[in-house]
């Protein structure tokens, strides 16, 4: 099983842009040295707790500081970008990383980002994402076209575009060609329509964990959509995000986790989000408890939501998750702000990669 890292980034709102930039590069280096496969970076323009508006800058800066880890924006919010500009930037950046780049796409799920870009809400965004990506795919194909869609317009020049003199067109398509670049899509709710759309296009799925039943539905939805279009689904492509904290003992891990950026993120930011999207019922059901979501506290999180404990305990929790949900190919650790006390966090990441995942029984 591989491990990945999702740098949302869940930062304290008081952090400066420079602090977040430096912290992001350090995390990328730590994950690369620990043997993580992927490093994914969120994109938001208005969220103080998730404040990285341009993940491509971090990807470009981290490229020469790392050796093996792959990078992805997770995700570029396509309705907020010019598709022609973004297609060229993505292709060029993938060439810089020479195979260590993949692409995440999404419509955008936060109303404040939508308002910033002139939309009253997020309702129309999915249709715009579809149109944007279709135009980007045509640009990467490097065949002449000119198209004005409902929301965007784009084209690609051909030999007859400027007949009075010869123009050599730069090849800013993805490294190794479009077919070599993985595209990934995230899913949050049960039977996610986003993952159905991803499966129909042979894009990879990333499941935001909301309980074993939701996780299973994410894979099943994606796999059924893949098969409906003649593709073969593989569990090795299925990624699942989890909050993870590892220490010598269960007690020490829980103590460190609750005092860390993980605890702060949940206490001040993620509790309302999980309640808004009704994600707690599935997790409570997994725990076998009869409690109301309003009763969920930090101790419940440490025991039932986070993969928290000694290496052996976390290994067991991952194996139970795999057994109950059907399994996945990559565990993706969610990022949290540990700028003020990074060493316990770095230790946890390193132990996950070296002591836990290599020993997980895949069933």
Swiss-Prot record:
Induction data: By both (-)-camphor and (+)-camphor enantiomers.
EC number: 1.14.14.108
Cellular component, GO annotation: cytosol
Keyword vocabulary terms for this entry: Flavoprotein, FMN, Monooxygenase, Oxidoreductase, Plasmid
Catalytic activity: (1R,4R)-bornane-2,5-dione + FMNH2 + O2 = (1R,4R)-5-oxo-1,2-campholide + FMN + H2O + H(+)
Functional pathway: Terpene metabolism; (R)-camphor degradation
SUPFAM superfamilies xref list: Bacterial luciferase-like (SSF51679)
Residues annotated as binding FMN: 74, 186-194
pH behavior: Optimum pH is 7.5.
Quaternary structure, from the entry: Homodimer. Likely forms a loose transient complex with a P.putida flavin reductase that provides the required FMNH(2) to the enzyme.
Family: Belongs to the bacterial luciferase oxidoreductase family.
PANTHER family per record: BLL0895 PROTEIN (PTHR30137:SF16), LUCIFERASE-LIKE MONOOXYGENASE (PTHR30137)
Name of this chain's protein: 2,5-diketocamphane 1,2-monooxygenase 1
């Amino acid at each position: 099983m591989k491990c990945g890292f999702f740098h949302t980034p869940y930062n304290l709102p008081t952090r400066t842009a420079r602090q977040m930039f430096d912290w992001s590069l350090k995390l990328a280096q730590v994950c690369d040295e620990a043997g993580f496969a992927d490093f994914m970076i969120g994109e938001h323009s208005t969220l103080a707790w998730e404040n990285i508006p341009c993940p491509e800058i971090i990807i470009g800066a981290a490229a020469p500081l790392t050796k093996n880890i792959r990078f992805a924006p997770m995700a570029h919010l396509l309705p907020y970008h010019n598709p022609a500009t973004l297609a060229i930037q993505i292709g060029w950046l993938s060439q810089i990383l020479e195979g260590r780049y993949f692409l995440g796409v999404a419509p955008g799920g936060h109303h404040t980002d939508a308002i910033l870009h002139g939309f009253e809400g997020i309702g129309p965004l999915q249709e715009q994402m579809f149109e944007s990506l279709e135009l980007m795919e045509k640009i990467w194909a490097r065949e002449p076209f000119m198209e004005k869609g409902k929301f965007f317009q784009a084209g690609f020049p051909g030999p007859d575009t400027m007949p009075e003199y010869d123009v050599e067109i730069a090849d800013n398509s993805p490294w190794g060609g479009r077919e070599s670049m993985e595209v990934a899509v995230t899913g949050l709710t049960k039977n996610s329509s986003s993952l159905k759309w991803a499966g129909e296009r042979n894009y990879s799925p990333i499941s935001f964990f909301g309980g074993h039943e939701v996780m299973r539905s994410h894979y099943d939805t994606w796999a059924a959509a893949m098969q409906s279009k003649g593709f073969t689904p593989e569990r090795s492509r299925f990624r699942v995000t989890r909050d993870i904290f590892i220490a010598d003992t269960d007690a020490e891990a829980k103590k460190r986790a609750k005092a860390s950026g993980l605890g702060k993120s949940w206490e001040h930011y993620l509790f309302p989000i999980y309640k808004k999207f009704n994600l707690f019922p599935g997790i409570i059901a997994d725990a076998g408890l009869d409690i109301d979501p309003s009763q969920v506290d930090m101790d419940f999180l440490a025991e039932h939501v986070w993969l928290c404990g000694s290496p052996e305990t976390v290994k067991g929790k991952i194996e139970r998750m795999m057994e109950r949900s059907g399994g996945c190919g990559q565990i993706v650790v969610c990022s949290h702000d540990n700028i003020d006390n990074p060493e316990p966090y770095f230790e946890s990441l390193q132990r996950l990669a070296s002591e836990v995942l290599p020993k997980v029984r895949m069933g």
